[in-house]
């Protein structure tokens, strides 16, 4: 039914049905279910249609898997991922004039610049392998053009501030947050 579901529940012998979309939960990498069912990760509220006990289960296993390989080290990717989302597929959030989505809080323009992997921006951003592949491709495209060094600091600041982010003083605070995750 194209993301639109009919949810019915029997409450005190009365059927209650609601129409709605589970798309916000799916974009967050989760699955809508009744909260009496064990969740292999954590429940998030407000992302599912239906009653108040129908919540989004975002599995902790969605965080497992590996980062794409490339010029950005695995450790550096992990630090950036932790700063952006706690390294979870957190869906999309409004940030500086547009939505930022997923593990690395990737904006649509960033996804286009990295070559549009995965066929769909939001799906890619909420997939660890695809989103890290996008970050690797973005760095391969921009880090030398802007005269930035091949360092985690440059990669983090470009990720935060765009192609010339390593030279922008506005990204220094972001770099300190990445450093606090154990990267240098």
From Swiss-Prot:
Binding site for substrate: 107-113, 138, 159-161
Record's catalysed reaction(s): Hydrolysis of (1->4)-beta-linkages between N-acetylmuramic acid and N-acetyl-D-glucosamine residues in a peptidoglycan and between N-acetyl-D-glucosamine residues in chitodextrins
Single GO MF descriptor: lysozyme activity
Active site per UniProt: 84 (proton donor), 95 (nucleophile)
GO cellular component terms attached to this protein's record: extracellular region
pH profile: Optimum pH is 5.5-6.0.
GO terms classed as biological process: defense response to Gram-negative bacterium; defense response to Gram-positive bacterium; killing of cells of another organism
Temperature-related activity annotation: Activity increases as temperature increases from 0 to 45 degrees Celsius and decreases markedly at temperatures greater than 55 degrees Celsius.
SUPFAM superfamilies associated with the record: Lysozyme-like (SSF53955)
Signal peptide span: 1-20
Top EC class for this record: hydrolase
UniProt subcellular location: Secreted
Pfam family of the protein (one): Destabilase
Superkingdom per UniProt: Eukaryota
EC number: 3.2.1.17
Protein function: Has antibacterial activity against the Gram-positive bacteria L.garvieae, M.luteus and Enterococcus sp., and the Gram-negative bacteria E.coli and V.vulnificus. Weak antibacterial activity against the Gram-negative bacterium A.hydrophila. No antibacterial activity detected against the Gram-positive bacterium S.iniae or against the Gram-negative bacterium E.ictaluri. Shows some chitinase activity but no isopeptidase activity.
Similarity comment text for this entry: Belongs to the glycosyl hydrolase 22 family. Type-I lysozyme subfamily.
Name of the molecule in the record: Lysozyme 1
Organism this protein belongs to: Crassostrea virginica
Lineage: Eukaryota, Metazoa, Spiralia, Lophotrochozoa, Mollusca
Gene that specifies this protein: lysoz1
């Amino acid at each position: 039914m194209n993301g639109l579901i009919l949810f019915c529940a029997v409450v005190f012998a009365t059927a209650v049905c609601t129409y709605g979309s589970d798309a916000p939960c799916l974009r967050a990498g989760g699955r809508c279910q009744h909260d009496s069912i064990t969740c292999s990760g954590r429940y998030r509220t407000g992302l599912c249609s239906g009653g108040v006990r129908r919540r989004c289960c975002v599995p902790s296993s969605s965080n497992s898997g590996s980062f794409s390989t490339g010029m950005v080290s695995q450790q550096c990717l992990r630090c950036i991922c932790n700063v952006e989302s706690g390294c979870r597929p957190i869906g999309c959030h409004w940030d500086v004039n547009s939505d930022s989505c997923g593990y690395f809080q990737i904006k649509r323009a960033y996804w286009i610049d990295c070559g549009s992997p995965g066929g769909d921006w939001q799906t890619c951003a909420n997939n660890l392998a695809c989103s890290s592949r996008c970050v690797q491709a973005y760095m391969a495209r921009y880090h030398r053009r802007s005269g930035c060094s091949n360092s985690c600091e440059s990669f983090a600041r470009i990720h935060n501030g765009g192609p010339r982010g390593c030279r922008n003083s506005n990204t220094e605070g972001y770099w300190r947050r990445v450093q606090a995750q154990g990267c240098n």
